[in-house]
Amino acid sequence: RAAQGQLWLPGAIASALAAGDEHAQTPALSEQLRLQGDHLARLHDFHGDHLGPRIARKHQAWLLESLTVQQAISAEDARAWRQTFNRLESAEAQVECLRKMTDALMSASPTTAPTIQIPSQLCPQMSVAA
């Protein structure tokens, strides 16, 4: 459970142990988001079009919680992204929403918890469940 939302954690711990370091290093935000994109694609491939998007929702929620703790995103923005992501029914829409979230986060100031466009402004053309 410690790795929920922190896909990079097992590898970082292994690297730290191999190097004799007492602290695992948190990767850059861009690397965390890249790993989430890979993970999302694999989830969809493994679980298929019906279960994949449903299972991906909790994984995305864990990522957003982790990013909130890291102060990479505000709790309010994380909540808005989660609500939007949870309404998406297709793998394609989820991947596109993650891409737009990644773009928004990467363009925000790295020194503060960013305030980014709310998902409905970024993903208006995506099909969402009513």
Locations of regions flagged by a protein language model:
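Alpha/beta catalytic cores of nucleotide-metabolism and tRNA/nucleoside-modifying enzymes
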Residues: 1-130
